[in-house]
Amino acid sequence: MRTVVYPGTFDPITNGHVDLIHRAARLFDRVVVAVAADTGKTPVFSTEERVELVRGSVAGDPNVEILPFEGLLVNFARTLGVSVIMRGLRAVSDFEYEFQLAGMNRRMAPDIETLFLTPAEQYAYISSSLVREIARLRGDVSTFVTPTVQAALRARFG
């Protein structure tokens, strides 16, 4: 079974993330969406809330599994027996960081490959941080996130 792990903070999950998950589900037998618990950031939503928001946003993809994880991603991937990590690249500005991260992961786990996917053009500019800021300022985020996430943001920010 060909499995890929797609890690992220997903605070919150956006339509860009959902696009990548659906596309990965067509390429792989199993997609594990790995929701990072220890991000070094202060998330708006708890790990459990983020897992549920991801679950609600990708319901209907039978080969997608959502799991929280802590610690190094390569260690988590190994515990799952996964040899491919998927990362999204929205713009050239993402590339340098993602390239460094992939290199570090390769150094720690030479048996695990990193695969980069770019989002569909209409999602290339969406980021979780921008969505949070728009929601915090009570703007309309309906074109950036699923209705499940929109409701959660409205409940959080008013």
Curated annotation (Swiss-Prot):
Substrate binds at residues 9, 41, 73, 87. The keyword Kinase does not apply. Its EC number is 2.7.7.3. Pfam families: CTP_transf_like. Its cofactor is Mg(2+). CDD domains: PPAT (cd02163). InterPro entries: Cyt_trans-like (IPR004821), PPAT (IPR001980), Rossmann-like_a/b/a_fold (IPR014729). It catalyses: (R)-4'-phosphopantetheine + ATP + H(+) = 3'-dephospho-CoA + diphosphate. One of its GO terms (molecular function) is pantetheine-phosphate adenylyltransferase activity. Pathway: Cofactor biosynthesis; coenzyme A biosynthesis; CoA from (R)-pantothenate: step 4/5. Belongs to the bacterial CoaD family. Homohexamer. Reversibly transfers an adenylyl group from ATP to 4'-phosphopantetheine, yielding dephospho-CoA (dPCoA) and pyrophosphate. This is Phosphopantetheine adenylyltransferase. It comes from Allochromatium vinosum (strain ATCC 17899 / DSM 180 / NBRC 103801 / NCIMB 10441 / D) (Chromatium vinosum). The lineage of its organism: Bacteria, Pseudomonadati, Pseudomonadota, Gammaproteobacteria, Chromatiales.
